[in-house]
């Protein structure tokens, strides 16, 4: 049987989830617990250029890493990762046994020659080098064999198979393993880094543990599967599997203490794990960040996400490019139309009158009397945002969010006048269609925020005044919305970014519209 090791990458790959902010105490404690558990190799974080923050698992020097390592290393090896081109080796002092033992170097296909020379320089400083090409699973056999021959010349500590897109099945993993194992020089260890987009990390790693080879293989994992997108192989699961089937002697309890003391709290604020968008990214051969970017828009249903992923050119799918994602998103949503007649039709109802804009915030529930009193006044037009309220009749319902329309828009038995943007095909007969792209905001974070798009529309309609209710601002909880079925979750980082961007846009719009909030809000204080 293959000699199997566990390499825990919680502090590095898991760090993408919480921006590496584990805290200095947390970093040291996690490393200590993994050491007590007997984890073979522990990745301490990234080596990068830039300003050092001792609360984050990103370092400028190995001396900074030594400050978070336990005095007794027991049987564990400590490593850090450096992305080629992002860390100046002039900062890397020669190996002296007081800090990390090895450096994992990651690079793209077009960087092979320079990256391998970079690896040699690290090797010459006395460190064990792990050669980790990004997206190995997308290499042709010829490309992979060419790389292996070059790797054999430098004889690093380990060479990695990396399933960046999380799309490999067991038969593909084993085919790559045998190809690499047959051609990689003896004495060089192998490693496998997976992503769990198809829920196959655990089974794929079990298959590798069962193959017959005298080569040591390291399996990357993280505590509780912590990692961006669909996450990674769970350290605790793999350790227990190796204990039960290969007489390994990992201590599981210290790993679970890391879960209990640190990871559960992070999980409450940041999501990771299997989801349909990540599954779609995998089957379309796209980087998982494309899926998360589109999913975080909270405007698309699953079918639309899949359609947009298919629009990305194959050669641009393996590396995430935010510009490409936004370009394809807007291209998909655009549906450019001439809406001049529609604008004039709405203007005839609204020009010179007060508008009561009802956003779906939770404050509507506590302010029903105030809202209904205002709505009953002469020359007041009520427009709700993406929902049909049950306590008041609306002049119009405004809709630009396809996901809202498909999942939570419910006109029940009410007769409604619907204003919708051109990116949505609706079934209602009483509808007015306005051009989607002309109502978009400049900031990516709020590009097609529905309430702001309605306010953008109102700038063309000359209302006397706009009263706003239910535009409360986002908080990290499930209590943002007037009705539970309208709920869309946002993590702490998204919440801050959304609130900041919306506040700035409202300030701009207040120069174009006379806006007054009549319910509590985080905006325009």
Put a short name on every predicted segment.
Residues 337-525:
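Metal-ion/cofactor- or nucleotide/acyl-coenzyme-handling active-site neighborhoods
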Residues 1-340:
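Catalytic cores and adjacent flexible loops of soluble metabolic enzymes
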């Amino acid at each position: 049987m293959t000699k199997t090791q566990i390499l825990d990458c919680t502090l590095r790959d898991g760090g993408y989830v919480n921006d590496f902010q584990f805290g200095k105490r947390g970093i040291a404690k996690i490393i200590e617990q993994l050491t007590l558990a007997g984890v073979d190799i522990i990745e301490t974080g990234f080596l990068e250029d830039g300003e050092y923050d001792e609360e984050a698992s990103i370092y400028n020097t190995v001396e900074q890493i030594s400050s978070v390592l336990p005095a007794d290393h027991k049987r564990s090896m400590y490593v850090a990762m450096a992305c080629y081109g992002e860390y100046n080796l002039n900062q890397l002092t020669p190996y002296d046994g007081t800090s990390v033992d090895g450096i994992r170097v990651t690079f793209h296909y077009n960087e092979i020659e320079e990256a391998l020379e970079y690896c040699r320089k690290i090797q010459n400083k006395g460190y064990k080098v792990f050669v980790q090409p990004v997206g190995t699973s997308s290499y042709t056999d010829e490309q992979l064999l060419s790389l292996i021959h070059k790797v054999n010349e430098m004889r690093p500590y380990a060479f990695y198979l990396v399933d960046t897109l999380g799309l490999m099945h067991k038969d593909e993993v084993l085919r790559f393993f045998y190809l690499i194992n047959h051609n990689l020089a003896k004495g060089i260890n192998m490693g496998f880094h997976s992503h769990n987009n198809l829920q196959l990390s655990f089974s794929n790693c079990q298959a590798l543990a069962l193959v017959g080879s005298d080569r040591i293989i390291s399996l990357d994992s993280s505590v509780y599967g912590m990692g961006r997108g669909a996450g990674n192989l769970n350290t605790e699961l793999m350790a227990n599997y190796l204990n039960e089937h290969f007489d390994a002697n990992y201590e599981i309890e210290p790993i679970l203490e890391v879960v209990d003391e640190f990871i559960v709290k992070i999980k409450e604020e940041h999501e990771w794990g299997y989801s349909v968008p990540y599954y779609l990214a995998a089957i379309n051969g796209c980087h998982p960040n494309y899926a998360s970017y589109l999913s975080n828009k909270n405007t698309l249903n699953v079918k639309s996400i899949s359609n947009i992923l298919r629009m990305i050119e194959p050669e641009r799918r393996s590396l995430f490019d935010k510009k490409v994602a936004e370009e394809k998103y807007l291209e998909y949503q655009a549906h450019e139309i001439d809406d001049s007649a529609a604008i004039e039709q709405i203007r005839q109802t609204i020009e010179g009158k007060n508008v009561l804009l009802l956003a779906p915030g939770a404050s509507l529930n506590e302010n029903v009397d105030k809202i209904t009193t205002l709505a009953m006044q002469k020359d007041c037009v009520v427009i709700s945002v993406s929902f049909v309220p049950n306590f008041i009749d609306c002049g119009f319902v405004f809709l630009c969010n396809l996901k809202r329309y498909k999942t939570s828009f419910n006109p029940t038995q009410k007769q409604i006048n619907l204003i919708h943007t051109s990116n949505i095909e609706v079934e209602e007969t009483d509808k007015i269609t306005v051009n989607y792209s002309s109502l978009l905001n400049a900031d990516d974070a709020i590009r097609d925020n529905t309430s702001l798009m309605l306010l953008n529309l109102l700038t063309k309609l000359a209302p006397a005044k706009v009263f706003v209710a239910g535009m409360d601002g986002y908080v990290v909880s499930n209590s943002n919305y007037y009705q539970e079925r309208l709920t869309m979750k946002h993590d702490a980082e998204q919440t801050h970014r959304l609130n900041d961007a919306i506040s700035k846009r409202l300030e701009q719009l207040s120069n174009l519209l006379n806006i007054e909030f009549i319910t509590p809000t985080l905006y325009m204080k």
